[in-house]
């Protein structure tokens, strides 16, 4: 049994920093561990243009702790009216690394998203031409589709066609939650990948609903049946390079989670790497952590792997029960739980 593990510095390929005063909590929490992060653009208003991404990037960089080398990888928010010229500007920038497809109404601050993903093929064509990755929140939002089926229906209705029509387009199936999603990524071409969150790896819908509703485990896409969780786990345990770390860390004030209509999102930034390590060790696959956390995402995004390292030590660490974020209490994912691994 190893008492420490040193890996190349990891990256987080999907997170939500939020904005304003919250950045003072979220940016250091990530930057102290991860070398880079794909930053979601679903602010209010959303980050629609390269110019807006540049301004947001500066606000993030202003909160990076002194002496810490961290690079935010910016993303633009696709809408029905995104011009092709904005895709070209993104491709020509050195800090915008992808465009994000949010079906309108699918998740937090997605009301400005795409109303019909099948009707923006001109944008997919431009992204393919200029080699700008497409990041997908893979859910439909039709009222008649059950919330637990939204990912499967999205694949059948939209994603399979997008993949077939644009074979040279890099696509990331963000926060994959179903066996159908895992199988889609496995069977698609090599320009298809998925990010995996700690909550979808470690939990299923029983952890949300059995014994009472647990609002701090509530996220979108929602937790699914155990069989879907096991499909995600298998992909990570076997070290499939199409699946890599993306926390989807997303803070909300406790008052907005513990409410009659609570917000979706799990704030996992501080605990993420120990959580992934704990899971992999439990499945005798700790040797897969470096690929999953440090190599596969960098390779997919065609960025250099980090040469510096981080070290995890076998030292019990209790996840804080509450974190002060801009004067608001935030309950983190796995709050109060003791993990066997901590950052050295």
Curated annotation (Swiss-Prot):
InterPro entries documented for this protein: Amidohydro-rel (IPR006680), DHOdimr (IPR004721), Dihydroorotase_CS (IPR002195), Metal_Hydrolase (IPR032466)
Family the UniProt entry places it in: Belongs to the metallo-dependent hydrolases superfamily. DHOase family. Class II DHOase subfamily.
Top-level class of the enzyme under EC nomenclature: hydrolase
Function, in words: Catalyzes the reversible cyclization of carbamoyl aspartate to dihydroorotate.
GO cellular component terms, A-Z: cytosol
This protein's name: Dihydroorotase
Subunit description: Homodimer.
EC number: 3.5.2.3
Residues the entry annotates as binding Zn(2+) 2: 100, 137, 175
UniProt cross-references to NCBIfam families, sorted A to Z: pyrC_dimer
Modified residues (N6-carboxylysine): 100
Keywords for the protein's UniProt record, in alphabetical order: Hydrolase, Metal-binding, Pyrimidine biosynthesis, Zinc
Organism: Alcanivorax borkumensis (strain ATCC 700651 / DSM 11573 / NCIMB 13689 / SK2)
Pathway noted in the entry: Pyrimidine metabolism; UMP biosynthesis via de novo pathway; (S)-dihydroorotate from bicarbonate: step 3/3
Transmembrane portions of the chain: none
Cofactor: Zn(2+)
Pfam families: Amidohydro_1
Reactions accelerated catalytically: (S)-dihydroorotate + H2O = N-carbamoyl-L-aspartate + H(+)
UniProt record, GO biological process: 'de novo' pyrimidine nucleobase biosynthetic process; 'de novo' UMP biosynthetic process
Residues reported to bind Zn(2+) 1: 14, 16, 100, 248
Residues at the active site: 248
Molecular function as annotated in GO: dihydroorotase activity; zinc ion binding
Cofactor binding annotation: Binds 2 Zn(2+) ions per subunit.
Binding residues for substrate: 16-18, 42, 137, 220, 252, 264
